[in-house]
Amino acid sequence: PYVTLLLIAANIVVFVLIQPRGGDSLEDIDRENRFLYEHAAVPCEITTGSPLTFAEITTGECGDAAGAGPVIRSEEPFFPSKNVYLAIFASMFLHGSWLHLGFNMLFLWVFGNNVEDRLGHVGYLAFYLVTGVMAMLTQLAFEPGSTAPVIGASGAIAGVMGAYLIFWPHA
């Protein structure tokens, strides 16, 4: 199950070596929040097609929450170089805690290796990524104006678990 192991390793490496986490100080919390807003998918950003402004981050109000038309912004995005669509993929490798990461990787290992054997390496990787994107689009359908970052591999792993259920319904 090479791809399953690669996905598990990638999630762990991102969490341990790239994603800031840690202390309870305001500086630590601010650093973690800045990282998430800079790299994670945010429904409001996908809805509007551009990164959040500072006002949207601090107020939690999306400029086009109601979908009533084009966004009129009086300030520049807080992270102007952020690609809001690539952030969907980045979010699949970001996790909120050791527990979040641990359970996601446990379920990926238990179900992913079997699904990978059935779909093949390339098909499985494509399936994993597509189900992760579909999970984000589902979240977007329910909360298009949310300014909270959406993180975790749970959506992609739910897709893998669904495939397992279809392939082995009596397991």
Task: Show where each model-derived region lies.
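A detector for small-residue-rich transmembrane helices and their helix-helix packing motifs
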Residues: P1-A171
